[in-house]
């Protein structure tokens, strides 16, 4: 189950042009976004650790997204 709130995901889909969005559609997208975010976060943590830091910085996130 996704930890991301459904309402903001619903708004994103509407912003993309949808007139109506089913709750299930918003849940599915939220789950996918959460999986992708977790993947990026894990890469960013590894980058921070490699640099000898415990703190994940924006640069780690940016590099993780690019890789």
Curated annotation (Swiss-Prot):
InterPro entries: Archaeal_histone_HMF, CBFA_NFYB_domain, Histone-fold, HmfB-like, TAF_TATA-bd_Histone-like_dom. Gene3D superfamilies: Histone, subunit A. In a chromatin histone fraction 83% of the protein is this histone. Cells have about 2.5 x 10(6) histone proteins per cell, enough to coat all DNA with a ratio of >1 histone dimer for 30 bp of DNA, cells are polyploid with 7-19 genomes per cell. Pfam families: CBFD_NFYB_HMF. GO terms for molecular function: DNA binding; protein heterodimerization activity. The gene is htkB. Disulfide bonds: none annotated. Binds and compacts DNA (about 120 base pairs per nucleosome, corresponding to four histone dimers) to form nucleosome-like structures. Histones block elongating RNA polymerase (RNAP). HTkB/HpkB has higher DNA affinity than HTkA/HpkA and compacts DNA better than HTkA/HpkA. Participates in both transcription activation and repression in vivo. Residues 20-22, 54-57 are annotated as: Interaction with DNA. Induction: After 17 hours growth at 85 degrees Celsius HTkB/HpkB is expressed about twice as abundantly as HTkA/HpkA (at protein level). This is Archaeal histone HTkB. Homodimer or heterodimer. Dimers then assemble into higher oligomers, with the DNA wrapped around the protein core. Higher order oligomerization of these structures can give rise to long, superhelical fibers (in vitro). GO terms for cellular component: chromosome; cytoplasm. It comes from the Archaea. It is found in: Cytoplasm; Chromosome. Keywords: Chromosome, Cytoplasm, DNA-binding. Disruption phenotype: Cells can be transformed but grow about 75% as well as wild-type in liquid culture, some differences in transcription occur; double histone deletions (htkA and htkB) cannot be made. Belongs to the archaeal histone HMF family. SMART domains: TAF. CDD domains: HFD_archaea_histone-like.
């Amino acid at each position: 189950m996704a930890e991301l709130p459904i309402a903001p995901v619903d708004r994103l889909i509407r912003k993309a042009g949808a007139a109506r969005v089913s709750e299930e559609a918003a849940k599915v997208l939220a789950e996918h976004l959460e999986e992708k975010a977790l993947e990026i976060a894990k890469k960013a943590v590894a980058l921070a650790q490699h640099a000898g830091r415990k703190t994940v910085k924006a640069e780690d996130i940016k590099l993780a997204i690019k890789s």
